[in-house]
Regions:
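Short, structured segments at the rim of ligand-binding sites
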Residues: 1-437
Length: 437
């Protein structure tokens, strides 16, 4: 098992650029299954979840070529559908949540798919009902295979229809869109997710010959087509990594520039950090985070405690609540964090409390942070990363802490962050990757 050994207290300075967006990468890579022609994808993040998905596509016969660092060519002209029946496929899907995004393309193009229980972060009940109901609305039917613990989904013909999603699921919306591009007639999806990841997927599919309108809204219309062709697509910068770097720069930075962040696609991220008192200077498509020894949390107009909560896009992404919470531990003032979309992502705060943070965990969804105003530094400690986002939050805490910390189970961090120790060490951090028993 690998761990990070972090020597805290070192100021970071310099320039850093975000990787490609993980969530978009998983979607658009799966979308290459929709055509037999070559699809080129650029700015692909070199992270565990994406690399495992690429290997899984290769296993089912997709031809993958690495054209350059972070650039790949995909051609799905000889897909081996028999591999879906193998125990190896089920095993790999069970360790990779992104594998669920293969269902829509396989169903749309080939009329069949296998649904194995996907893996990923253990952060509460992440239902697949939205996916199932969407496929059923298009005319698919399901059957459970007990001895393999999977569902098989088939459709002789997909037919477009109107559907109102029970939740604005990002992966559910993406999956339904990818299946519906080949459905006969018109598909209308209301209460669709509209994150930049979905927008990018729709724009790539349109470049491949799909007919999708309503992009960037929660009402998406898809006119079915007979086939799609190749395309050349570039993945957006990862907004979650941008937010993570803002948090690091605010707490332990000595002047950090974050390059090429795609400001128009950051939504409420910048404003939310500013509500915590963090100074952010926008310079074109770059962000400059100056050194800030003190930052003061805003309060509401009536003087009540600031509340920060997540919401479906264009609300604040839930993936940054963990980072924002760590930043608040050294701010001046108090703030209530309300994690509405997942019910166990705040449980990692026990580790921050052990490090000296003043946090009251009200329930699985809410935590109050009373900031130290940098008067009392966090203490170093040993901890384990429960998921990707808590992992990076704990890494930020360890960078600011006095002494040397150890974070175990860093494979969780590797799932979402590319060479994070090397990139932060280039700014002055002291992070060592070590093999431990």
């Amino acid at each position: 098992m690998e761990s990070f050994i972090i020597e805290g207290g070192h100021r970071l300075s310099g320039t850093i650029a975000p990787q490609g967006a993980k969530n978009e990468a998983l979607e658009v890579i799966c979308a290459t299954l929709l055509t037999s022609e070559e699809v080129i994808i650029r700015n692909v993040p070199d992270i565990l979840d994406v690399n495992n998905l690429i290997k899984l596509l290769q296993d089912i016969g997709v031809k993958v070529k690495k054209l350059a660092p972070n650039e790949f060519s995909f051609q799905a002209d000889e897909v081996n559908l028999d591999y879906l029946e193998s125990s190896d496929f089920v095993k790999k899907c069970s360790s990779l949540r992104g594998s669920v995004l293969m269902i829509g393309p396989l169903l749309g193009r080939f009329g069949k798919a296998t649904i194995a229980k996907p893996g990923g972060d253990k952060i509460g009940r992440r239902r697949l009902d939205t996916h199932f109901l969407g496929f059923k609305n298009l005319g698919a039917h399901f059957g459970r295979v007990e001895d393999r613990d999977v569902y098989e989904i088939q459709a002789d013909k997909l037919v477009g229809t109107y559907m109102l999603l029970d939740e604005a699921s990002v992966t559910g919306t993406a999956n339904i869109i990818m299946a519906a591009v080949f459905a006969e007639g018109t598909t209308t999806i209301y209460n669709a997710a509209c994150e930049p990841y979905i927008q990018q997927l729709c724009m790539m599919l349109n470049a491949m010959g799909a007919k999708i309108s309503g992009i960037a809204s929660n009402l998406i219309t898809i006119e079915g087509v007979k086939e799609l062709h190749g395309a050349d697509h570039r993945i957006l910068p990862d907004m979650i990594e941008v937010g993570s770097f803002i948090g690091i720069a605010a707490m332990i930075g000595d002047g950090v520039r974050i390059k090429d962040v795609s400001v128009p696609n950051l939504g409420l991220i910048l404003d939310t950090f500013r509500r915590l008192g963090v100074q952010i200077i926008e310079d074109g498509d770059d962000l400059l985070i100056p050194r800030q020894d003190h930052y003061v949390i805003d309060s509401f107009i009536d003087g009540t405690i600031m509340t920060i909560s997540d919401a479906p896009w264009p609300g604040l992404t839930p993936d940054l609540i963990s980072v924002l919470l760590v930043v608040a531990t050294q701010a001046q003032g108090s703030v209530l964090f309300h994690q509405k979309m997942f019910e166990s992502r705040l449980f990692f705060v026990d580790k921050l409390i052990d490090m000296g943070a003043q946090i009251i965990l009200c329930d699985p969804h809410r935590a109050v942070v009373v900031g130290h105003d940098n008067a009392k530094k966090l203490r170093a400690g040993r901890m384990s990363s429960p998921d990707i986002r808590a992992g990076i939050a704990l890494l930020i805490a360890a960078l600011t802490a006095q002494g040397t910390s150890r974070i175990d189970n860093i494979a969780q961090i590797d799932r979402g962050y590319e060479n994070i120790e090397g990139r932060l060490n280039a700014l002055g951090a002291k992070i060592q990757r070590a093999e431990v028993c």
